[in-house]
Curated annotation (Swiss-Prot):
Top EC category: hydrolase
Annotated gene: dinG
Gene3D superfamilies in the record: P-loop containing nucleotide triphosphate hydrolases, Ribonuclease H-like superfamily/Ribonuclease H
Domain Helicase C-terminal: start-end pairs: 714-883
GO CC, any one term: cytosol
Name of the molecule in the record: 3'-5' exonuclease DinG
E.C. number(s) listed in UniProt: 3.1.-.-
Stretches assigned to the Helicase ATP-binding domain: 241-496
Family statement: Belongs to the helicase family. DinG subfamily. Type 2 sub-subfamily.
Amino acid sequence: MGIATFAVVDLETTGNQLDYDEIIQIGITFVRQNQVIDTYHSMIRTDLEIPPFIQALTSIEEEMLVQAPYFNEVADDIYQLIKDCVFVAHNISFDLNFIKKAFEKCNIQFKPKRVMDTLELFKIAFPTDKSYQLSALAESHHIPLNNAHRADEDATTTAKLMIKAFEKFEQLHLDTQKQLYYLSKNLKYDLYHILFEMVRNYQTKPPNNQFEQFEQIIYRKQIDLKKPAVNFDGTLKDLYKNVTQSLNLTYRPQQLYLAEIILDQLMHSDKAMIEAPLGSGKSLAYLLAATMYNIETGRHVMISTNTKLLQSQLLEKDIPLLNDVLDFKINASLIKSKNDYISLGLISQILKDDTNNYEVSILKMQLLIWITETNTGDIQELNLKGGQKMYVDQKIETYVPVRHDIHYYNYIKRNAQNIQIGITNHAHLIHSDSENTIYQLFDDCIIDEAHRLPDYALNQVTNDLNYSDVKYQLGLIGKNENEKLLKAVDKLEQQRILEKLDIAPIDVFGLKININELHDLNEQLFTTIYNIIQTSDVYDDDIHKYHYVYDFETGEILKDLRAIIDKLNKTIEIFNGMNHKTIKSVRKQLLYLHDKFKLIEQSIKDHHTSFISIKNLAQKSTIRLLVKDYDVKDILTKQVLEKFKSLTFISGTLTFNHSFKAFQNWFNEDIDFNTFEISTPLTSSNHTNVFVPNDVETYNYKNLDDYVASIVDYIVEYITVTQSKCLVLFTSYKMMHMVQDLLNELPELEDYVILTQQQNQNYKIVQQFNNFDKSILLGTSTFFEGFDFQANGLKCVMIAKLPFMNKHNIKYWLMDSEFTSTFKDYVLPDAVTRFRQGLGRLIRHEDDKGLIVSFDDRLVNSTYKSFFAQSLEHFKQRKGNIKQFNKLLNQIQRSIDNESKS
């Protein structure tokens, strides 16, 4: 690594306003030759107030700074320490700009010669990490971080992760290091200096048989699964007893009973629906049932989960735990479709591609690292988003396989017979083509969180044209001879002329003209759609931030679609009879677009349900034209019901009014399902209450002021009495932000952190909410599911409105034709299920203390209140005004205080 010294800096500040806020803590960790050689830390005094959010986040209070120096008192010392170092920080723009500004106020010009952003570094070095927040990285790489958001600890943790990244780079093959170095010249910061030193000082390593080479790529060699040697003569009960004893788990007869039910369905190739409440230990039950089934029959079992998170938990935590205590090994593997796995030929093509913008350069570097680590070749391990995902999707779509290509799917297929348990998720299960996957090896399937299955099917019923996607796909071909695929075609034509290649002449000029006309025709199509939006009734989906048009004439759209399809046909004809791989890539790209437009045109002609969505009413680029081509029931019947001989649907909320009929209605075939409703282990308790205020102003969507004011009054009352955290759920962002504005003005809540849901930030917000003792989280009803509410003492959820979907919701529109009564058969069961899921997340254990406050009195006063009653069987139900609410809170608080004393 040479003799460079790295100063890894972390700052805590009063906020993120560069011209106003100030530093309150600085931590610096010095690294040389992959060793921590020194540290510096100081609290920094400020005359500004430290906001409650910052105090909660950093645990730095104003009293802690009274004896600390002002920055100008230590500025020169800090400057002398770091002026000759490589300046390093995690998300460097924040720390570097703040410290520059602080130095500037002290008449010190700080201009580090080299800077490095560890956010950029870690994305490359750790390409499969799901989050690049420092706390998540520390947890992922087993580096202790006891006090996140304290500058000294954050700086040291960042330094240790940086060392780990450097050591990882140093172990790479020289060819990989060189490629990383050349690509790093396209990055924003100075990583290329470090990589240059690595290449320059490379020490030859002994041959490593774990790696092989394909063209310029060094990749990890796949190790075939060994056929499992299973030696177990006992019963399922014996297996369960062994596992619970070995893992020091509570022996639960109910959990064993659940496992026995599942095994019985598997053994008899039956189809079953099981409602097993949250906290009943479903995962262990079905894993042991699947294992016992494999022991007795040798047959494989597929398990489908709701999310990638649950999928990862099974593969990375639950099954390895079982393997640690069993006398035999369970071979489990992720099962996906062929298109989810990448080939080395495709990676090679990506690396050779001329596109070298920042995002693509990061992607190429990630691929070089990832391919030395992956055992699966599953491209989704990289968690690609945005431009990177679009780029890779396009490369996959237009890839023409090379000779002797190595495809990771073939490895999965080769080892399929030795897989005992296959793990997938609902999206893959529903999307999979049984003829192009190894799904056909599985006759038996257990579907966990089965109540979510229809939602994933709903995502598969439409085809769409997306303005940005079409423009991007055309852009990948290029507009002139110096861009993208057109450049490659022009180069091929020049080679044909100069080297007299034995291929037909290529009309490059005609191709260029046609591509530019296709750009114009695409603009015309989406201008037509945009004009339709301007003259139509537009409905808002406030939760997902989309606007929809459902009722419109399609004549002009069909006319524009036909013009594009005709032009694509003429363009494709240019390449008739040509087989060169460059031509194949362009042709494949054009055919992809042709098929996309043709499918939409035919669906509209066939009078399929069509609609328009737009993210921003002022931006044509956010338009999508969608057509419903399938029924959800058809998809679920074909992709799930008919695919497996044995099916076990399991969920904590599979019944509606104690009946499985609502879920059974999602399938076309009249199947005689075995049904099991396992009672909850939780019993009625003084610590589980639901309160419905009777003094709240009637909800009026045109004037929410009074309704919102009532919600705020109850929040303040709760906080004042309990001093506990609170989750408040809304069905619209508008109401949520109105409540937020009022709460921020209240002096009673000065020491509380008010958190609000933001798109794509749920994980981060939940982490903050769970970490802060005094916090209020305002979110939408999407938080009903999958939210692990952590709190000491009382857990409180306030519900502004019951989670009914609006009749203008896109789901309502898509499902309207599939039910006799959309409200009774779809909307009401959906609302009850979501409500039950929310309660289940709140109360998971016998000693949990929970309070639900529903401002929506439909919970107890509507004609359909009985359908919600099942959710409230273990809650004490109360109605009253805010004084009675205060009385209830004091009763609960006294009970909790007495318990803590005893």
